[in-house]
Amino acid sequence: MLFPLCLSRRGKKRGEVEGRSRGECGEMLSERVRKSLIKGSAIRRAFEEGQRLAALYGADKVYDLSIGNPAAPAPEEIRRAMREIAEEDALSLHSYMEDAGFREVREAISENLNERLRKGEFLLERRDDYAAREEGGKSREEQEKQGRTREKEERRLPFTAENVIMSHGAAGAMNIFFRTVLDPDDEVMVLKPYYPGYTSFIGNCYAKKVEVDCQGEDFQIDFSDLERKITVRTKLLILNSPNNPSGTVYTAETLRTLAEILRKKEREIGHSIYLLSDEPYRELCYTRERLPFIPSFYENTVIAYSFSKSLSIPGERIGYLLIPAEAEESGELLLGARNSTGALGFVNANAFFQKVAAASLQAKAPLAYYRENLDLLYQALLESGFSCRKPEGAFYLFLRVPDGEEERFLERAKAHRLILVGGSAFGMPGFVRISFCGKKETIEGALPVFRRLALEYGIRKEASGTYR
């Protein structure tokens, strides 16, 4: 904290906190913000603690693995585009545009996505397949006779500029969509483990977060818990794959089951349930399997996308909201989302980086950089005796704390100047999140600390020459 706040109101009226005048001790803050300050952001708090320790001991003596701040340099396409676009006509470059963003940028994004779909970069669900399951099961021959649906769909270019709304990252896209569809007391399903920011985004609309349990070492969805918790107030579900913090990539079979449950519940409660696919890590997948394209599995899907992680430009805050035509009331959603962009004060996404992003759509994420860090960290943790699953995507590793006491583990780590984030922030007490997107030297410097911690917890005996 940069300044002390006296935020307790118990037993006091407004303006009567221990003799202080009205306006002190957070009395002028809204109740929602006051509670947010008390709880704070675990990720930001850890990051700021790392900055404080770095100022005391030197950055090379602090091992900050808390935040997803990529150390891989932005691709050359980004730097080249910045130089070229900076020379464009200043008036057109820096002026307002329509709320949804520059049309030529949205056209470039939609055309790029269409091209990737056409090339088969994503795994598509066969619409005739799931229609057959709902109708009681048709043979593959019957499906092929009905027009070879898959071939037609893959040739079709499903997206246009009208489906795209430029935003300040995926977080901005989510806030735009939430304001568009949520009323107070509506319910939003979040799948454990989940990004902590969802709590604030949902709270901005006075809606309610409903946590859904996961199961197994691979953090798969507990479908019985999901089905039990969907009510008439359920408006949408957030899916994050590859997942932050676990690195899990949900399989096609998982998505089919999820889609079937959502359709079943839609019929029961009498209205649509939107699935918001949060995709800042779409390009960061370490398996050879194609990443499922979620709108092809469930028609009421919208996508919040960010260029931050894949192109190493998190501070530029650029992304988009994609609303496919198949989504229920898609026309109204698009109109509402444009309105929400202005009403939230965004007005429009960053003009300069809209154009930079459009010019860099062919740039590739530095997967080799992250994979090298991951392999180094994962192998060392296993050899030290820790229990963790190798992530399939994103750039985080979710480590189980040996005795389940995450706060004590975090404090012990901090005593060695190792900064991590507790699993409670992600809805999963007893874990810690480790970011491996930083510099390799930081990862290497952290490994002896993990070995010391393993010794302290008695999960690994010291071997001569192994630890320092």
Q: Where are the regions that the model predicts?
A:
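Conserved PLP-binding catalytic core of the aspartate aminotransferase-like
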Residues: 72-73, 371-375, 384-416, 432, ...
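Active-site pre-lysine segment of PLP-dependent enzymes
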Residues: 199, 203, 210, 220-233, ...
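Conserved core segment of the aminotransferase class I/II
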Residues: 299-371, 375-378, 454
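Conserved small-domain helix->loop->beta segment predominantly found in fold-type I
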Residues: 345-350, 364-367, 375-401, 422-428, ...
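N-terminal small-domain helix-loop-helix segment of the aminotransferase-like
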Residues: 29-134, 140-169, 176, 360-363, ...
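Conserved PLP-anchoring active-site segment centered on the Schiff-base-forming lysine
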Residues: 163, 180-201
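PLP-dependent enzyme catalytic core of the Aspartate aminotransferase-like
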Residues: 111-115, 227, 361, 408-421, ...
